[in-house]
Amino acid sequence: MKQNYFYKSRHELILSPSEEESSPYLHRFSHQLPTELIQSFGPTHISLPFPLHLSILLQEKHVMTAKTEIGWLHQGIEKAFESVPWKMAPSFATRINPIVPAPIALGFVLSLEKILHIDEKIPKLAQDYRLLMLECARIFHHLRIIHQTVALIAPYALIQFSAHTLSQAKELQTSINYDQNNYPRWEIGGITHPIYQTWIREFQKTANATSKAVHLLKRSVLEESQIQKRLTGIGVINKENALSFGITGPCLRACGIGDDLRKSHPYFNYFSYAPTIFTQKDGDAWSRFKIRLNEIEASFNIVQKIIHALLQEIKNADLISIPNMFEQGDAHSVPPGMETSHIESPEGELAITIVSNGKDVPYRVRIRTPSFFNAAAISAFLKNADIDDIVLIILSLGITGLEVDR
């Protein structure tokens, strides 16, 4: 008869009464039983936010080490840029993050405008509209991470409410574009279509309704003790390790370092709106969760300021974009040069370097995504964690798979 037995530690077996009676000799060999186990996790798992393979060394239920293997979504997109015409390249760049494509697309546009020496000539109306897209992308991305976390550990009613709030944020993001997953309103030199007061008023109503829903969600989430209990003390990293891994964004600010490119190196028209920077000291998943909640409300404050500015600018605006060579056709060469733009995406610093050799396609494109550095630090975040907390910790990092596997 097959006997099933389990053990708590090297010297303690958990046996049924019949096993205790029939197999006393097992105690003599208990010191030979293994206490460590290598568990393979991924690359495809229903609870993982993106394809990722983890080789985890477990001691009982605790993670001792975790080796990360990426590349399951590899696109070779940086090499593919070398055959994409300049005018199509910003839209092509959105494949790196199709969930919130505005930062990557506008970062590419900014680098290209620097090569063309038109980055300081962009009309203020167009710059403010670009900021509106970036802040709506930040709101949707953070709400998406919050909903995925709440869906794992919160009561059913709160899960439904967070899903409804997320759908409102998606509608807000979609309303500033002509489709859900691309951004056809922007172009090199400005934006493509004029903006009307009637549209601004409708967008303002949608933003106000979403802001109220987010405020209620934040209050409900902070009052739910179960969420705080599960997230507090897991996935901890100190500021020294965070800096050594190159981590930026909410994960770095959760360690107490208030670094944000919107304030330290403002681009477009951010210097007019002075975004609020939130920090925490504990560096755990709960700290990252609270920072996202606070940044959503701060983004809504910026959105309201931009709306009021747009209503004034529409009356006096003569240009929504400056004339440039890309308006005359698709196949145009760009002067030789190399420029880099830095954007504060929802997860941290996004840097895009473009090299032109004077032809009609890029010579070289190099993209620094924050998710890649967060994924590289997964082993540090998981060290000494409980096996039940692995998915929650990875979710708290806000990693986008396609940003990792470029």
Question: Which role does the model predict for each range below?
Answer:
Residues 2-406:
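Active-site bordering "gate/hinge" segments
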